[in-house]
Design a protein with these regions (language model features):
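Pocket-forming structural segment of enzyme catalytic cores
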Residues: 1-67
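Acyltransferase
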Residues: 73-132
């Protein structure tokens, strides 16, 4: 994947924060947490995983609000921890994409009760939109 990560400064220059992203991979905003010292810049043909839309959060490099990377069926993000449990729609998309890649014409995933996960997602999205 055409991208470059540089690490300027020291550990004190880390980008650490919660964030909300808009991503073409999910119908709902994606909530996540980042903690990284690198500054990543995407090359030609590589798109962002999403764009930071909250007042908190830094993205790949603290310059352009782009977060993560997408290239073909590869997804990368600085969001970690509980990314997938807090974003069940994104999780379903990634699982379905993998199944479709492995099994041509894979059946759609059967819906699960995502009530708890969606509640966690809503809570974080509301918290981050009000507190920045």
């Amino acid at each position: 994947i055409d991208m470059e990560t540089r690490r300027p400064g020291t550990s004190a220059d880390r980008l650490i924060d919660n964030m909300v992203l808009e991503s073409p991979l999910a119908a709902h905003p994606v909530v996540g947490y980042e903690n990284h010292a690198g500054r990543t810049y995407l090359g030609e043909g590589v798109e962002g995983f999403g764009r930071v839309v909250s007042s908190c959060g830094h993205g790949n490099n603290d310059d352009d609000r782009v977060e993560g990377a997408r290239y073909k069926n590869v997804f990368g993000t600085y969001s970690h921890g509980s990314l997938l449990p807090k974003n069940p729609v994104l999780c379903d998309f990634i699982l379905q994409t993998a199944l479709n890649h492995r099994y041509d014409g894979a059946e759609p995933l059967a819906p699960l009760d995502d009530t708890l996960e969606l509640n966690a997602h809503r809570y974080m999205q509301e918290r981050l939109s009000h507190n920045g």
